[in-house]
Amino acid sequence: MRPVLSVDFNNTFGSLPSDFFVKMNPEIMPDLKLIKLNEALCKDLGLQPDQLREQDGVNFLGGKNILSNQKPLAQVYAGHQFGNFVPQLGDGRAILLGELIGQDGNRRDLQLKGSGKTPFSRMGDGRSGLGPVLREYIVSEAMSALGIPTTRALAALFTGERVVREGPVPGAILVRIAKSHIRIGTFEYFAHRGEIDNIKTLANYVIDRHYPEIRDKQDKYVQLLERVIEKQAFLIAEWMRVGFIHGVMNTDNMTLSGETIDFGPCAFMDHFNIDQSYSSIDAQGRYRFSNQPHIANWNLSRLAETLLPLIDENQNNAIKQAEKSLDAFVPLFTAHWTKVMGEKLGIEDPIDSDKLLIENLLELMQTGHSDYTLTFRKFSKILTSNDNKDWLNLFHHPEDPNLLIWLKQWKKRLKSIPITKEQIAKNLDSTNPYFIPRNHIIELCISEAIRGDLSRFDKLAQAIKTPYTEHPEFNDLRKPPEDHEIVRQTFCGT
């Protein structure tokens, strides 16, 4: 006799006032089938993979079997989208199934994406096509393996439906795990409505859930703002360390927990371009690679505006305090960016003069159209083999004398570091990934999966688990695109 599926939900968001959500079940999908189950994450959450692979478990993951201790709901929020305020957005195709306490003692949301219509769907059908589900599964799990704060993918499912996007495609659901789904846009929703009590309730909830160490502080709302600023400064620098471009940094896509969320038109850079933008809906390049820190700071300013009534009853005093807190973003980001870029050159504790070394390299990469990931990964080989040729050949003009001048300066800087070349090479390989999910490979996986072949997707899902380790069996998935393979635009797919 099979054991009855049991999941220990511990729900708190549903205890907030009803203004925060609509209680509802997901739509029942006709034929749920498992595409991929993240077994390691299952175990981290105290779930049993074997049970979830059974049809009862698949039906649970897809929202068809609702357990008695679940309280599914759709969350409401607003947001600035490409700088324009939308007073109500909300979970238009997502349902929060409940909250779990993981093996580490931390609370996680269990959410479905593509689970049907909600009151916040507007003109949408509440569904997701297979492509966006596979993309988010791959990219979010890659980000996690790269060491970057992110929501996670617990599972991907077929729904048994066909959904119409550019044409008919298989319907799918992503089962997403997050520290929470509270966004800057959640605060904006209540601020726009002038509901200060709800802003306070939400702020207290975020503090209790994510920043309990400031719960009893007299200036806890200022400290809340500052904690989120710190988290986002760190996060954006980490994105840029690996050449990641989010593509749709609206305020409804920025979390209070500091996790990356929503991977619609995201991409990893191939050849380096400081102003690279892939998103088809970002015609002006608002969310281009170089502008991500500025946008994060702009979004945080919108959060600060919502918190002003809590920071000080005197608005002028509140504004001064919020501005002081926001002024910390640029130095925080710059410090972490300099640190991680120094580490990508083998310099563990970069000093001010190293900034020029970093900037000069990026200029050479820009003019030479070198691949972002491979340029940094090959530094360790230069140290261990004393051969520059492979590295130079990454540039369109490997004979450019400025490349050798830069290499000479870099090697001279490394000589001042009191550890062996072998140890520096090891450090380099621990921060410069061997493997990233390339845009053209993701697109190939999606097109093959739509035709019924998931083999390349399965291989890619395996490859992203250990991005800093060399695995020759995945070399076909890590090569930069040929000219005819280059992905020039990415799409939300909603």
Segments (PLM) and residue ranges:
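Short, contiguous strand/loop micro-motifs
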Residues: 25-26, 125-127, 222-223
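Short secondary-structure boundary micro-motifs
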Residues: 3-4, 10-11, 17-20, 81-84, ...
